[in-house]
Swiss-Prot record:
One of its GO terms (molecular function) is structural constituent of ribosome. It comes from Shouchella clausii (strain KSM-K16). One of its GO terms (cellular component) is ribonucleoprotein complex. This is Small ribosomal subunit protein uS11. GO terms for biological process: translation.
Length: 133
């Protein structure tokens, strides 16, 4: 009975509060969803949110309002880590691009630069056929 296993206190580690004053907001806006990731200048993720993760399902994920809520949620978490200024890089053709940028400004983050990093093919893959509704 002497070599019984020692009971250890293994509690999940609490996320440390980083002091980062500037960062980059990556907004990926597709036709189906909007994903907002806020990183430090080196690209390490600090917070993220998406329309689907906030409870929007189906076609509601692709609305500007869902993108606004996702950007707000990610920005509030980033501001808890001390973020004040932000550069925005937007990718994709979705409806939530402008709404996400506006809500980042409305929450209180100062937007220094907005750049569009949507990939444009040099005539690569064949695009999907036109929809007939």
């Amino acid at each position: 009975m002497k070599n019984m296993a020692k009971k250890t206190n293994t509690r999940p580690k609490r996320r440390q509060r980083k002091n980062i004053d500037s960062g980059v907001a990556h907004i990926r806006s597709t036709f189906n969803n909007t994903i907002v990731t806020i990183t430090d200048p080196h690209g390490n993720a600090i917070s993220w949110a998406s329309a689907g993760a906030l409870g929007f399902k189906g076609s509601r994920k692709s609305t500007p309002f869902a993108a606004q809520m996702a950007a707000e949620s990610a920005a509030k978490t980033a501001m808890e880590h001390g973020m004040k200024t932000i550069e925005v890089s937007v990718k994709g053709p979705g409806a939530g691009r402008e709404a996400a940028i506006r809500s980042l400004q409305a929450v209180g983050l100062e937007v220094n630069m907005i750049k569009d990093v949507t990939p444009v093919p040099h005539n690569g893959c064949r695009p999907p056929k036109r929809r007939r509704v």
